[in-house]
From Swiss-Prot:
Homohexamer. The gene is ppa. The keyword Magnesium applies. Mg(2+) 2 binds at residue 71. Its cofactor is Mg(2+). It comes from Mesorhizobium japonicum (strain LMG 29417 / CECT 9101 / MAFF 303099). Mg(2+) 1 binds at residues 66, 71, 103. Gene3D superfamilies: Inorganic pyrophosphatase. This is Inorganic pyrophosphatase. Pfam families: Pyrophosphatase.
Amino acid sequence: MRIEAIATGKNPPEDVNVIIEVPIGGEPIKYEMDKEAGTLFVDRFLHTSMRYPGNYGFVPHTLSGDGDPIDVLVCNTRALVPGCVINVRPIGVLVMEDNAGQDEKVIAVPSPKLTLRYENVTEYTHLPEITRQQVQHFFEHYKDLEPGKWVKIEGWHDSKYAKKMIVDAIERAKKGK
């Protein structure tokens, strides 16, 4: 995969492209894209028997505060193939702290061009309460059995916060080149 050839999105931060690393409901394995090689590697096997509550990946050509591209959880009902690209709309952010520092997960939904299921979902609060609880529970506990690792949820933020985070990450990536 030539990551450099994949656009950040059609109209960032209103919509962005996400390269999927882990599918919804897949085996409890964390895959991570090696940005230099353009190849998916097994990062680790989750010690818990939990499965990702959405398709998980990153926005190309961004750099978050932790030095990696922005993480995104795409809320939808279909498992996507790792390595594929999906166009999404950011609707919020789950802010966490873990053993490595602050960690933020953008929450997004597929663009209306792909499915009408989420066309009226513009904020994370528009998702069903159970979906928000499942996302938070997953990220709060997916590292529970890994020695020396922990996660603390700090809270949720709206789409405006998510879009600002994306703009800042795009600028940070441009400066880093």
